[in-house]
From Swiss-Prot:
It comes from Rattus norvegicus (Rat). Receptor for prostaglandin D2 (PGD2). The activity of this receptor is mainly mediated by G(s) proteins that stimulate adenylate cyclase, resulting in an elevation of intracellular cAMP. A mobilization of calcium is also observed, but without formation of inositol 1,4,5-trisphosphate. This is Prostaglandin D2 receptor-like. Disulfide bonds join 104-182. InterPro entries: GPCR_Rhodpsn, GPCR_Rhodpsn_7TM, Pglndn_D_rcpt, Prostanoid_rcpt. The chain crosses the membrane at residues 21-41, 58-78, 107-127, 150-170, 195-215, 262-282, 307-327.
Length: 357
């Protein structure tokens, strides 16, 4: 047996490991995602009769709901196996001895699946934000809530097919220390192309998705800055244009303040996702191209996996904090009102000068 990992064939949980952190993270993730879904429902996502009092859900909130459900499913399917391993002091391979390595492979598949699916959905959210700000006419004609509902199933289908490749012989799943985690094997003594190739392919795809998300957010930020400049230099025209297009906003076009909320929320989530994804990407490339053919960084690999799992825990809490009325009020007072006041003062000064002349 070509063992490249210290705990690859372990049957017991390594000494010195505790389930406390896993239990806390599971509880925080479960509570956070449930509360996030409640807030989404209260914000109008569950309205069945769109109208003046019940506007239809925006595409952005449909995407947020899909991401939250994905996080919740991942947390409910993965974390109980970790806690069960700690409770019985058995590794994942020994929790169901009759199944052989199947439980470990299922755990690794779920880890890779939910990691990729949530990244794809986050990219869709960033793309939606960029299109709504930079290409509003295209957005109005082609981006609808019905199409937004398809994002989560399509992302799930792609992730399902991609992450199932190890079951077809391309790639391999392995148990990591302390025996409570399984994931994609990132090193191999004989430099197997299928093992190393799938690891590099998965991490490269993740890196590409994270990069595309950052690019979309930078584009959205550039559009927001351009809109702010136009509002400063042409306040009358902006007000007139907004009044003329009021019906369009009521029929699904984003409100400026709502877009600002969405963008800040998306920026925070993207920064978090980038920070939590980079360690895994680095470890995959390091394991594939390092000179020594042995696993000398079990703790580093475990930390990278834990960083990846933190995303589904912290994301909903960011959403909960940001969607509270107190935080929104403080945010709008700190950023939106000063800009409006400054534009009003600038416009008043310009009008007085024109009347004087």
């Amino acid at each position: 047996m070509n063992e490249s990992y210290r705990c690859q064939a372990a049957t017991w949980v390594e000494r010195g490991s505790s389930a406390t952190m896993g239990g806390v993270l599971f509880s925080a993730g479960l509570l956070g995602n449930l509360l996030a879904l409640v807030l989404l429902a209260r914000s109008g996502l569950g309205s069945c009769r769109p109208g003046p009092l019940h506007p239809p859900p925006s595409v952005f909130y449909v995407l947020v709901c899909g991401l939250t459900v994905t996080h919740l499913l991942g947390k409910c399917l993965i974390s109980p196996m970790v806690l069960a391993a700690y409770a019985q002091n058995r590794s994942l391979k020994e929790l169901l001895p009759a199944s052989g390595n199947q439980l470990c492979e299922a755990f690794a598949f779920l880890m890779s699946f939910f990691g990729l699916a949530s990244t794809l959905q986050l990219l869709a959210m960033a793309l939606e934000c960029w299109l709504s700000l930079g290409h509003p006419f295209f957005y109005q004609r082609h981006i609808t809530a019905r199409r937004g509902v398809l994002v989560a199933p399509v992302a799930g289908a792609f992730s399902l097919a991609f992450c199932a490749l190890p079951f077809a012989g391309f790639g391999k799943f392995v148990q990591y220390c302390p025996g409570t985690w399984c994931f994609i094997q990132m090193i191999h003594k004989k430099r197997s192309f299928s093992v190393i190739g799938f690891s590099v392919l998965y991490s490269s795809l993740m890196a590409l998705l994270v990069l595309a998300t950052v690019v979309c957010n930078l584009g959205a930020m550039s559009n927001l800055y351009a809109m702010h400049r136009r509002q400063r230099h042409h306040p009358r025209r902006c007000s007139r244009d907004r009044a003329q297009s009021g019906s369009d906003y009521r029929h699904g076009s984003p409100n400026p303040l709502e877009e600002l909320d969405h963008f800040v929320l998306l920026a925070l989530t993207t920064v978090l996702f980038t920070m939590c994804s980079l360690p895994l990407i680095y470890r995959a490339y390091y394991g594939a191209f390092k000179l020594v053919d042995r696993a000398d960084g079990d703790s580093e690999d475990l930390q990278a996996l834990r960083f990846l799992s933190v995303i589904s825990i912290v994301d909903p809490w960011i959403f909960i904090i940001f969607r509270t009325s107190v935080f929104r009020m403080l945010f709008h007072k700190a950023f939106t009102r000063p800009l409006i006041y400054r534009n009003w003062c600038s416009h008043s000064w310009q009008t007085n000068m024109e009347s004087t002349l």
